[in-house]
Design a protein with these regions (language model features):
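Adenine-nucleotide phosphate-binding core of ATP-dependent small-molecule kinases
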Residues: 27, 163-194
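Conserved phosphate-binding loops in N-terminal lobes of ATP-dependent enzymes
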Residues: 2-67
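Short beta-strand-loop/turn "lid" adjacent to the catalytic site in phosphate-handling enzymes
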Residues: 43-92, 128-132, 137-140, 168-183
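Gly/Thr-rich phosphate-binding beta-strand-loop-beta motif of the actin/hexokinase/Hsp70
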Residues: 1-24, 102, 108-131, 147
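Glycine-rich phosphate-binding loop plus the immediately following alpha-helix
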Residues: 98-107, 132-174
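Conserved phosphate-binding catalytic cores of ATP/NTP-utilizing and phosphoryl-transfer enzymes
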Residues: 81-111
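Acidic-glycine-rich active-site phosphate/pyrophosphate-binding loop
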Residues: 71-81, 118, 155-161
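Short, charged, surface-exposed secondary-structure boundary motifs
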Residues: 37-38, 81-85, 143-148
Length: 194
Protein backbone atom coordinates (compact mmCIF):
# COMPACT_ATOMS: atom_id res chain seq x y z
CA UNK A 1 0.00 0.00 0.00
CA UNK A 2 1.22 3.45 -0.86
CA UNK A 3 1.26 6.07 1.85
CA UNK A 4 1.47 9.82 1.40
CA UNK A 5 3.39 11.64 4.13
CA UNK A 6 2.97 15.42 4.21
CA UNK A 7 5.06 17.74 6.38
CA UNK A 8 3.91 21.36 6.31
CA UNK A 9 6.69 23.28 7.99
CA UNK A 10 7.32 26.96 8.53
CA UNK A 11 9.54 27.27 5.45
CA UNK A 12 8.63 24.39 3.11
CA UNK A 13 6.06 21.72 2.38
CA UNK A 14 7.65 18.30 2.04
CA UNK A 15 5.77 15.35 0.59
CA UNK A 16 6.95 11.74 0.47
CA UNK A 17 5.53 8.58 -1.02
CA UNK A 18 6.14 5.68 1.31
CA UNK A 19 5.75 1.97 0.64
CA UNK A 20 7.00 -1.11 2.52
CA UNK A 21 8.73 1.07 5.15
CA UNK A 22 10.70 2.92 2.46
CA UNK A 23 10.43 6.39 0.94
CA UNK A 24 10.08 5.85 -2.82
CA UNK A 25 9.66 9.45 -4.00
CA UNK A 26 9.98 12.92 -2.47
CA UNK A 27 8.62 16.35 -3.40
CA UNK A 28 9.36 19.78 -1.93
CA UNK A 29 7.30 22.97 -2.37
CA UNK A 30 7.86 26.52 -1.18
CA UNK A 31 4.20 26.69 -0.18
CA UNK A 32 1.17 24.41 -0.02
CA UNK A 33 -0.12 23.38 -3.45
CA UNK A 34 -3.25 21.32 -2.86
CA UNK A 35 -3.73 20.59 -6.58
CA UNK A 36 -0.19 19.14 -6.76
CA UNK A 37 -0.88 16.94 -3.74
CA UNK A 38 -4.14 15.71 -5.28
CA UNK A 39 -2.30 14.93 -8.53
CA UNK A 40 0.34 12.97 -6.62
CA UNK A 41 -2.40 11.03 -4.80
CA UNK A 42 -4.08 10.09 -8.09
CA UNK A 43 -0.90 9.35 -10.06
CA UNK A 44 0.57 7.08 -7.39
CA UNK A 45 -2.72 5.55 -6.18
CA UNK A 46 -2.25 6.59 -2.56
CA UNK A 47 -4.24 4.58 0.01
CA UNK A 48 -3.14 6.11 3.33
CA UNK A 49 -2.04 9.61 4.30
CA UNK A 50 -0.46 11.30 7.30
CA UNK A 51 -0.18 15.02 7.89
CA UNK A 52 2.23 16.91 10.11
CA UNK A 53 1.49 20.63 10.14
CA UNK A 54 3.29 23.26 12.22
CA UNK A 55 2.10 26.13 10.02
CA UNK A 56 -1.39 27.54 9.52
CA UNK A 57 -4.08 24.83 9.60
CA UNK A 58 -5.46 23.92 6.19
CA UNK A 59 -8.88 22.38 6.58
CA UNK A 60 -9.38 21.97 2.82
CA UNK A 61 -6.37 19.65 2.62
CA UNK A 62 -7.52 17.66 5.64
CA UNK A 63 -11.00 17.23 4.11
CA UNK A 64 -9.48 15.96 0.84
CA UNK A 65 -7.15 13.57 2.65
CA UNK A 66 -10.00 12.24 4.84
CA UNK A 67 -12.26 11.84 1.81
CA UNK A 68 -9.77 10.14 -0.52
CA UNK A 69 -7.50 8.17 1.82
CA UNK A 70 -7.32 6.54 5.19
CA UNK A 71 -6.12 9.67 7.00
CA UNK A 72 -3.85 9.87 10.05
CA UNK A 73 -3.50 13.05 12.09
CA UNK A 74 -0.79 13.34 14.72
CA UNK A 75 -2.90 15.43 17.05
CA UNK A 76 -6.02 13.28 16.95
CA UNK A 77 -5.01 9.75 16.03
CA UNK A 78 -1.65 9.07 17.58
CA UNK A 79 -1.37 6.66 20.47
CA UNK A 80 1.85 7.68 22.15
CA UNK A 81 3.92 4.60 23.07
CA UNK A 82 6.23 6.73 25.21
CA UNK A 83 5.84 8.58 28.50
CA UNK A 84 6.52 12.26 28.90
CA UNK A 85 6.56 14.83 31.68
CA UNK A 86 6.27 17.42 28.88
CA UNK A 87 2.75 18.38 27.78
CA UNK A 88 2.44 16.62 24.42
CA UNK A 89 -0.28 19.09 23.40
CA UNK A 90 2.50 21.67 23.19
CA UNK A 91 4.75 19.50 21.02
CA UNK A 92 4.66 20.31 17.31
CA UNK A 93 3.62 17.57 14.91
CA UNK A 94 7.12 17.61 13.41
CA UNK A 95 8.83 16.94 16.73
CA UNK A 96 6.27 14.30 17.65
CA UNK A 97 6.72 12.51 14.31
CA UNK A 98 10.50 12.47 14.71
CA UNK A 99 10.44 11.16 18.26
CA UNK A 100 7.96 8.43 17.24
CA UNK A 101 10.26 7.49 14.34
CA UNK A 102 13.19 7.33 16.77
CA UNK A 103 11.11 5.09 19.04
CA UNK A 104 10.23 2.83 16.10
CA UNK A 105 13.81 2.55 14.81
CA UNK A 106 15.61 2.40 18.17
CA UNK A 107 13.09 1.20 20.78
CA UNK A 108 15.69 0.18 23.39
CA UNK A 109 18.22 2.99 22.93
CA UNK A 110 18.74 6.52 24.14
CA UNK A 111 18.29 8.77 21.10
CA UNK A 112 18.88 12.48 20.54
CA UNK A 113 16.90 13.77 17.57
CA UNK A 114 18.27 16.99 16.05
CA UNK A 115 16.03 18.59 13.42
CA UNK A 116 17.36 21.51 11.40
CA UNK A 117 14.55 23.49 9.86
CA UNK A 118 13.34 27.03 10.42
CA UNK A 119 14.36 26.29 14.00
CA UNK A 120 16.75 23.68 15.32
CA UNK A 121 15.08 21.34 17.80
CA UNK A 122 16.63 18.86 20.20
CA UNK A 123 14.49 16.02 21.51
CA UNK A 124 15.44 12.98 23.53
CA UNK A 125 13.94 9.52 23.77
CA UNK A 126 15.31 7.40 26.60
CA UNK A 127 15.94 3.65 26.52
CA UNK A 128 13.00 3.38 28.93
CA UNK A 129 10.81 5.10 26.30
CA UNK A 130 10.43 8.45 27.96
CA UNK A 131 10.27 11.57 25.81
CA UNK A 132 12.27 14.49 27.10
CA UNK A 133 11.91 17.69 25.13
CA UNK A 134 15.13 19.59 24.64
CA UNK A 135 15.90 23.03 23.29
CA UNK A 136 14.65 25.08 20.37
CA UNK A 137 17.00 27.57 18.74
CA UNK A 138 17.01 29.65 15.53
CA UNK A 139 17.83 27.80 12.32
CA UNK A 140 20.35 28.86 9.68
CA UNK A 141 18.12 31.23 7.69
CA UNK A 142 16.63 32.75 10.82
CA UNK A 143 20.10 33.51 12.20
CA UNK A 144 21.26 35.13 8.97
CA UNK A 145 18.06 37.17 8.69
CA UNK A 146 18.23 38.35 12.29
CA UNK A 147 21.82 39.54 11.78
CA UNK A 148 20.95 41.46 8.61
CA UNK A 149 17.78 42.88 10.21
CA UNK A 150 19.61 43.98 13.32
CA UNK A 151 22.90 45.20 11.87
CA UNK A 152 22.55 47.93 9.24
CA UNK A 153 25.78 47.17 7.36
CA UNK A 154 25.46 43.38 7.37
CA UNK A 155 23.41 42.11 4.46
CA UNK A 156 21.78 38.71 4.03
CA UNK A 157 24.06 36.15 2.41
CA UNK A 158 23.75 32.74 0.79
CA UNK A 159 26.15 30.94 3.09
CA UNK A 160 28.66 28.26 2.17
CA UNK A 161 30.49 26.02 4.60
CA UNK A 162 33.58 27.94 5.78
CA UNK A 163 36.99 26.73 4.66
CA UNK A 164 38.64 28.00 7.84
CA UNK A 165 38.01 29.59 11.22
CA UNK A 166 39.81 32.70 9.93
CA UNK A 167 37.67 35.07 7.83
CA UNK A 168 38.84 36.91 4.72
CA UNK A 169 35.81 39.20 4.41
CA UNK A 170 32.42 39.98 5.94
CA UNK A 171 30.69 37.10 4.14
CA UNK A 172 33.17 34.55 5.47
CA UNK A 173 32.91 36.12 8.95
CA UNK A 174 29.14 35.57 8.86
CA UNK A 175 29.60 32.01 7.57
CA UNK A 176 32.04 31.21 10.37
CA UNK A 177 29.79 32.74 13.01
CA UNK A 178 26.54 31.25 11.82
CA UNK A 179 27.46 27.86 10.35
CA UNK A 180 30.26 26.95 12.73
CA UNK A 181 28.20 28.44 15.57
CA UNK A 182 25.41 25.96 14.75
CA UNK A 183 27.94 23.15 14.49
CA UNK A 184 29.35 23.93 17.94
CA UNK A 185 25.86 24.36 19.39
CA UNK A 186 24.94 20.86 18.22
CA UNK A 187 28.18 19.40 19.58
CA UNK A 188 27.50 21.16 22.88
CA UNK A 189 24.00 19.72 23.17
CA UNK A 190 25.27 16.24 22.30
CA UNK A 191 27.90 16.58 25.03
CA UNK A 192 25.34 17.78 27.60
CA UNK A 193 22.83 15.04 26.83
CA UNK A 194 25.35 12.14 26.99
Amino acid sequence: MRNLLIDIGNSFVKVALHEDRKVIKEFKFDDLKIDEIVNIMKKYKVVNSALSNVSNPNHELEIILKDQTSFFSFKNDVKIPINSPYSLKEVGDDRLALILAAHDEFPNDNVLVVDMGTCITYDLKSSSNEYKAGGISPGLKMRIKSISDGAFKLKEINPEYPKSYIASDTKSSLEIGVILGIQHEIKGFISEYR
